[in-house]
A protein has these predicted regions:
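Repeated loop/turn-to-beta-strand initiation elements of outer-membrane beta-barrel proteins
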Residues: 72-83, 116-118, 170-173, 233-236, ...
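Transmembrane beta-strand segments of Gram-negative outer membrane beta-barrel proteins
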Residues: 27-46, 77-85, 371
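Transmembrane beta-strands of outer-membrane beta-barrel pores
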Residues: 38-44, 70, 87-93, 124-126, ...
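Detector for outer-membrane/organellar transmembrane beta-barrel domains
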Residues: 77-79, 243, 274-296, 300-376
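Outer-membrane beta-barrel "beta-signal"
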Residues: 406, 419-433
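Hydrophobic, lipid-facing positions within transmembrane beta-strands of outer-membrane proteins
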Residues: 58-64, 103-106, 158-162, 221-225, ...
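Outer membrane beta-barrel
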Residues: 67-194, 232, 407-409
Length: 433
């Protein structure tokens, strides 16, 4: 999403920031922190379909972060105003060009009333109970970063939004308005090959898909709401989203590869809390993803509505060892109509998709070494995605991470198996200041 579309908001925030900083006493000046990092990711099963062979990540990155609490103006101090700015400068050797990412976050937050918090600007939005699984969290994600081995921080993309949180003893309410659409960053064949139904095979640079985003106008503003309350250590959430699919799951023109982001309403709920007797934390989340343009599966060019369910459990054990399990189901709601409207050559999806996940975490050396294995497995597609990693916090400033993204499966159109030609091992070295 081009930042120019929300130029007025960002300029206003920047103007307040500059005024606050310029007029602040030297002792109250905001402090700069962040990190510099170098990353390398080598392919271990290269299908030679992407634009570069042998690797899919080689980059140097610098992050700059400023947080400031202005108090020069009485009203800013009274409202506990916070100005936050975070940006990355990236030298992406895979793309052979430096990239100024612009602000990853740039917002102003304040509390005008004792029960109301406001945040306006570019910000990371997230909710839900899943571990790498998102049902009611319909905010944008960067799955390319996820697959090539960037830090988990880069999985979630910022949104240009206004957020209002209202709190009371009875419950709390989050209201979010997003006037500028931000899509998921999905594999497009340049860096990561993928299964393209237009070719009926795994493709790379030869893919010629084009994505059409909803234009920025009042009628296209996305609205999110979350009502939540904690009762006896159990958090109950209800969620609503009115917006668009963040991945291009609709065709405007199938012959020319013109895809778009159909309208979507999401209704969901979740609960999370401790498990009696057995110990640990359990969660349950469900959501109805109502595809507004599929006409009860009569439109074969648009994603059908689905009901989704997630059950999770995690527990810590002695010696800094933790286990997490999840079971995830996606059920198509109008499957008979969906099948009846398929054409010859169309790929028929399963009515029910199932996926299991496992997370194992063990800390060593006074918790300075963290070893993790995360596994996705689908008995429907019979594919596996392994995410092993080992991180070593050598000092307060230096951190080294080595890991991998390993994809296994025989079906080219499987959710994870389609990336088997992109399996990689990576290394990240970071210095924080």
């Amino acid at each position: 999403m081009n930042a120019n579309k929300i130029l007025i908001i960002l300029v206003a925030i920047a103007a307040i920031s500059i005024y606050a900083v310029v007029t602040a006493p030297a002792a109250d000046m905001p402090k700069l922190n962040g990190f510099v990092e170098t990353d390398i990711g080598l392919k271990v099963n290269d299908d030679k379909l992407a634009s570069k062979n042998g690797y899919n990540m080689a980059e140097q990155r610098a992050e700059f972060k400023l947080r400031y609490f202005p108090d020069k103006l009485a009203i800013l101090k009274q409202w506990n105003t916070e100005i936050f700015f975070k940006t990355d400068v990236l030298m992406d050797e895979y793309m052979e060009q430096p990239k100024w990412w612009g602000p990853r976050e740039l917002y102003i937050a304040f509390t005008p009333l004792s029960f109301a918090d406001v945040k306006i600007g570019e910000q990371i939005l997230t909710w839900g109970t899943g571990d790498y699984i998102f049902i009611n969290d319909q905010f944008p994600k960067d799955y390319t970063s996820f697959i090539i081995g960037r830090d988990d921080e880069y999985l979630k993309l910022p949104s240009y939004a206004g957020r209002l949180t209202l709190s009371s003893k009875l419950a709390s309410l989050d209201l979010v308005a997003i006037p500028a659409f931000t899509p998921n960053n999905v594999p497009n064949g340049n860096r990561i090959s993928f299964f393209d139904p237009l070719f009926d095979r795994i493709v790379g640079t030869q893919s010629n898909r084009y994505f059409v985003e909803p234009p920025m106008k009042i009628d296209n503003t996305e609205v999110e709401a979350r009502l939540y309350r904690t009762i006896n250590s159990y958090q109950w959430d209800t969620n609503y989203n009115h917006g668009y699919y963040k991945s291009p799951v609709g065709y405007k023109n199938q012959q020319t590869g013109l895809l778009y982001y159909p309208e979507l309403d999401t209704y969901g709920a979740s609960i999370q809390g401790p498990v009696p007797i057995a110990g640990g934390i359990a969660n349950f989340e469900t959501g109805l993803l109502d595809s507004k343009e599929d006409d009860y599966a009569k439109n074969r060019l648009v994603q059908d509505s689905t009901a989704q369910y997630l059950v999770g459990y995690k527990r810590g054990f002695k010696n800094d060892f933790e286990v997490g399990l999840q079971y995830y189901i996606i059920q198509m709601l109008h499957y008979t109509a969906y099948k009846n409207n398929l054409l010859a050559g169309d790929i028929q999806n399963d009515k029910v998709y199932q996926q299991y996940t496992l997370r194992l975490t063990k800390l060593f050396a006074n918790q300075t070494v963290n070893t993790t294995l995360f596994v996705f497995y689908s008995p429907v597609d019979n594919d596996v995605y392994l995410r092993p990693s080992l991180s070593w916090k050598a000092t307060d400033a230096w951190n080294l991470v080595v890991g991998g993204n390993i994809f296994l499966g025989n079906q080219d159109n499987a959710a994870w198996g389609q990336y088997k030609g992109d399996s990689n091992i990576y290394c990240r070295l970071r210095y924080s200041y």
